[in-house]
Amino acid sequence: RGIRRLDLAVSTHIHEDHLCGLLRAARITPPAVLWQTLPPDLYRSLRPLDGSVARNLSESKFMQALNDYGTLCALVEDHGGTILAPKSGQELVIAPDLTVQILSPSTKKQLALADEINALYNSANVCSTFLQRLDALDARMNNYSLILRLNYRGTRILLPGDTNVTGYDGIDPADLRADLFKVGHHGQKDGADEALAELIRPTAVVCCASSDRRYNSAHPDTMKLLADHGAALYLSVCPPVPGMQI
């Protein structure tokens, strides 16, 4: 589409559906800056994981994402780019009239994630321990997501990655107020609840959902909850929600 430059790319967290496509885009147009959630030089100590030890598709995908994370970071630096790990509390002007507020992860969360990553790789030679830690980190990874609130000329946009309802701890409730909410975790059942909807009070909700509903994305209960709070719903590819016109 004629895009010749990427000033900024954001990797919210290390899961296949959020990172592997970003690597493909970066190979075409390497970004000048990469935001992600780990110490910028940690990737250098991560050796490639052997996906053949995976016992199921989830483990295989997660190992691929971890490998692609290292490849992405190396690609950015090899092309003269900068890797950053924004922290909660920062507010950055990234373009005229556009500011980004970093809501999560906190320094504590970033350190915890780095510790989990290091422990995982240090156990790679003990298959049973490695796979146990792999599954545990996979289950927790969503709530290590980078959470951003954009403000463009007074319109606030909340982008929580795959954060579920338990992952907003430590964030000032006032900072969650937004006009547009990209519902977390693809609109699955744990992507929003009554309390979160009351805090955000969005007028519009965007849900990025898979069409096969394999992971129960765009869950009807979640969509109805947000619509009942007055939000207009905008969805990607997913089947109609019974009883609703989307």
Roles of regions detected by a PLM:
Residues 14, 60-68, 214, 218, ...:
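Catalytic cores of large soluble enzymes that bind and process phosphate-bearing ligands
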Residues 43-47, 161, 224-228:
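An exposure/low-complexity boundary signal
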